[in-house]
Amino acid sequence: MRVKICGFTDPGQAQAAARLGVHALGFVCVPGTPRYVDAARLREIAAALPPFTFKVGVFVDAPVEAMRAAVEAGELQGVQLHGEESPETCAHLARTLPGILRIKALRVREPADLEKIALYVDAIEAVLLDAWHPTQAGGTGRTLDWKALQGFCPALPWMLSGGLRADNLAQALDILTPDAVDLSSGVENGVPGQKDLSKITQILHIAQGNTGQRRPPLCDGT
C-alpha cells in the first residue's frame, strides 16, 4: 500500500517525511489556498529532500505554463489535477509535460459520479477519489461514503483520499482496495501545512500492514 502525504509547506517536515518512508509528497500549487507554496518555496523544499523522492504538484484548472513552471521549480514527477480539467486537457499534458505522471482527482458526491472515470481512462495514469465540497477542491477533512464505494475497481490505479486519519484508515481499507492513499489534514494538528510526524508514522504502519493491493505507478514509473 503506497502512501502520499499532501500539502507540505516546510522543508524540514518534508525531508523528515521522506526519510520515514512516505512514497510520494504533494505540494499545493494553487494560489490563495492555505497550503500554497510558490515556486521559490517549492524549489527550497525540493532541495532539502533525499534523492529519488517522488514529488507531485497539485493544481486546479491551471494553465499549462504554470504547471510547467512548478514542475521545473520543484523537479516534480507528477501532477494532480483537482479542477474541471477535461479528458482532452489531461491527454494534452502527455505531450506538453512528457514523462510526468497525471493523476485526476474526482470529487465524489454520489456513486453516479464514478461514471466520469471512463472518460479519463486513456488520458491519465491514476485517478484519485476525494470527498465533495461546494467550495474547496481538497484538504477538507471530509470522508467519502466508503460502503457506497465497496467493490469499486476501475480500469486504472486509484487513490483514496478524503478525511483519512490514523483512527479511520484501517476501517477504510477493510472496505475498499485502493492502490494508494492520500492524506493532508489528517496528519496535521489543526494548522494547514504543518505536519505531525508521529501521525505520519502511524499512517505508514497501518499501510504497511495492508497487503494484497495492486501496485500503482506512483514512485517507480511502472
Swiss-Prot record:
Pfam families: PRAI (PF00697). CDD domains: PRAI. GO terms for biological process: L-tryptophan biosynthetic process. Its EC number is 5.3.1.24. It is an enzyme of class 5 (isomerase). Keywords: Amino-acid biosynthesis, Aromatic amino acid biosynthesis, Isomerase, Tryptophan biosynthesis. One of its GO terms (molecular function) is phosphoribosylanthranilate isomerase activity. InterPro entries: Aldolase_TIM, PRAI_dom, RibuloseP-bd_barrel, TrpF_fam. Disulfide bonds: none annotated. Gene3D superfamilies: Aldolase class I. It catalyses: N-(5-phospho-beta-D-ribosyl)anthranilate = 1-(2-carboxyphenylamino)-1-deoxy-D-ribulose 5-phosphate. Belongs to the TrpF family. NCBIfam families: PRK01222.1-4. PANTHER family: N-(5'-PHOSPHORIBOSYL)ANTHRANILATE ISOMERASE (PTHR42894:SF1). HAMAP family: PRAI. This is N-(5'-phosphoribosyl)anthranilate isomerase.
